[in-house]
Amino acid sequence: MDASGASSFLRGRCLESCFKASFGMSQPKDAAGQPSRRPADADDFVDDDRWITVILSVVRIAACFLSMMVTTIVWNMIMLILLPWPYARIRQGNLYGHVTGRMLMWILGNPITIEGSEFSNTRAIYICNHASLVDIFLIMWLIPKGTVTIAKKEIIWYPLFGQLYVLANHQRIDRSNPSAAIESIKEVARAVVKKNLSLIIFPEGTRSKTGRLLPFKKGFIHIALQTRLPIVPMVLTGTHLAWRKNSLRVRPAPITVKYFSPIKTDDWEEEKINHYVEMIHALYVDHLPESQKPLVSKGRDASGRSNS
């Protein structure tokens, strides 16, 4: 069955206009009325340490986890009913993400701007930078139907969510050693081709502690070479301020999600893997605000390339 019908049930005009009113979501335009690049304003965010703000933050976090627990329990039950139908479970997993992710972002209350949404329904390998737990909420809400994600194999041991992740046919990677990781990537690529799916990956391989962009792993390029799917970069800004790693405090920092046009991989060659990684990493460096750019180390530029 074709899984490329990617429009989300939450993207109807009425619901979308309601969401824009609630979150301040808009697509910037220039004087001619055409979409234009909106400068990131997350760096201008000023923290508020008043006690009422701290209390509200605790309430929001509690509401997020309670809400997620309820929807996760409900969808685990649905998945068990749909056990004989793998593709139906993939679609239900996406539906769970759309409902839960949108609800969690509403609870957090961050103003959100989405740009380039015309590229959000392509069957592709979606990649995005990872600096906060909020990134996961956004991805859950925004990914098109027929999309699976990749996580470490240990996710199955996360109570409720791990079981739902597996039941929804999301992919897992064994990172215990390089050979196991390579074989896992091959299995992911085969599953994506066989089931006609899209895929979303955090190419850094982990969450940044500081919000600054980390070097990219090569796994997403290997998958692109095996599937020949285009790569759609998604640049997330401001999420590192909205919910910092290892913090119990959320903040109403403005968030921007920007989709870039698909990068075709039809003619890519395996000998140029390092070049492709550097090229896409440089795209992120160019479009992230100063607070999220990687620090320049001696002998290397901001994109991680050698200056020599």
Swiss-Prot record:
GO biological process, one term: phosphatidic acid biosynthetic process
Pfam families with a match to the protein in the record: Acyltransferase
Keywords, ordered alphabetically: Acyltransferase, Lipid biosynthesis, Lipid metabolism, Membrane, Phospholipid biosynthesis, Phospholipid metabolism, Transferase, Transmembrane, Transmembrane helix
Motif HXXXXD motif positions after renumbering to this chain: 130-135
Chief location category: membrane
Transmembrane segments: 65-85, 124-144, 148-168
Entry's EC annotation: 2.3.1.51
A single cellular component GO annotation: membrane
Compartments, record wording: Membrane
InterPro entries: AGP_acyltrans (IPR004552), Plipid/glycerol_acylTrfase (IPR002123)
Catalytic activity from the UniProt record: a 1-acyl-sn-glycero-3-phosphate + an acyl-CoA = a 1,2-diacyl-sn-glycero-3-phosphate + CoA
Alphabetized GO MF terms: 1-acylglycerol-3-phosphate O-acyltransferase activity
Topology class, membrane: Multi-pass membrane protein
Domains as described in the record: The HXXXXD motif is essential for acyltransferase activity and may constitute the binding site for the phosphate moiety of the glycerol-3-phosphate.
UniProt record similarity statement: Belongs to the 1-acyl-sn-glycerol-3-phosphate acyltransferase family.
PANTHER family in the record: 1-ACYL-SN-GLYCEROL-3-PHOSPHATE ACYLTRANSFERASE
Function: Converts lysophosphatidic acid (LPA) into phosphatidic acid by incorporating acyl moiety at the 2 position. This enzyme shows a preference for medium-chain-length fatty acyl-coenzyme a substrates.
Protein name: 1-acyl-sn-glycerol-3-phosphate acyltransferase
